[in-house]
Amino acid sequence: MAVYTDVAADELADFLSRYDIGDLLSYKGIAEGVENSNFLLHTSRGYFILTLYEKRVARDDLPFFLSLMTHLADSGINCPQPVADREGRTLATLAGRPAAIISFLDGVWPRKPSVVHCAGVGQALAKMHLAGRDFAMKRANALSVAGWRPLFAAAEARADEVQPGLRDFLAAELSYLESGVWPSDLPQGLIHADLFPDNVFFIGDEVSGIIDFTFACNDLLAYDVAICLNAWCFEADHAFNVTKARALLSAYTRERPLDAAEQAALPLLARGAALRFLLTRLVDWLNVPEGALVKPKDPMEYVRKLRFQQNVAGIRDYGVEIAGAVA
């Protein structure tokens, strides 16, 4: 979450008058994240989140995201629910941006994910995948392999400003992943596609909610697992934590076993996941709007993760002989 577009108090008051959420007591921008402008609303009826959708989020995709949250919540997945205005609409316009109000979830995201947290997110991800099986709406993943070349083109001229040689490193990896090695015949379904620690809330050791579905789409289910391996299983010094990976994979596969092809493909999927986030972070790092209340994330973190994944020989390197085995 972040703030790119500010909202004047009188403009916000007029906007909120269309909703039955009580009187506004206070509001503040939320600086975390990199994609949309988000505000915490405190009203006489509690707390809500106001999101103004920016950048990579197409307005035509918003009904998908909002309907998905409703579907998952109805299926027992703890996630925010869209709040309708008095006309029954969940999508509106504020400050020239598409906007929605969603419910507030209790909990905090883990700043230093533990093994227990990794197990929790593995289980929650699998349950979300299962709950998404009967969601009727579809959305292609615009940030899968076909979407990486345009990102590279947007950043390549200045990539070496971040690290000398980065452009050639990215070009070589992209060419490899575009060479026909990327799998297309693995189980597919609804994926979150951005399940980082700041998108999972915990109360104690229990997952209390999953947030931020603005990258959700239909793609390889194991790709979502690979994204989580990269996001949850590296330490602050960039070392890969096999114990965390084992916990995440074991918890996931207790709910939804990975088949043999998914297990074999997981290291390749993790390479692709690392490149995808490296590229989007690089573009963001090089193009932060002046004066924006935003904290761009370091692309070099994902350079290191990609280098690790390039050297993974198989799923054993993630701490398991067969995904689903409990250590």
Curated annotation (Swiss-Prot):
GO molecular function (one): homoserine kinase activity
A Pfam family that the UniProt record links to this protein: APH
Pathway: Amino-acid biosynthesis; L-threonine biosynthesis; L-threonine from L-aspartate: step 4/5
Catalysed reactions, semicolon-separated: L-homoserine + ATP = O-phospho-L-homoserine + ADP + H(+)
One GO process term, biological-process aspect: threonine biosynthetic process
Highest rank taxon of the organism: Bacteria
Keywords: Amino-acid biosynthesis, ATP-binding, Kinase, Nucleotide-binding, Threonine biosynthesis, Transferase
The protein's Enzyme Commission number: 2.7.1.39
InterPro entries assigned: Aminoglycoside_PTrfase (IPR002575), Homoserine_kinase_II (IPR005280), Kinase-like_dom_sf (IPR011009), Pseudomonas-type_ThrB (IPR050249)
Family indicated by similarity: Belongs to the pseudomonas-type ThrB family.
Protein name: Homoserine kinase
Origin organism lineage: Bacteria, Pseudomonadati, Pseudomonadota, Alphaproteobacteria, Hyphomicrobiales
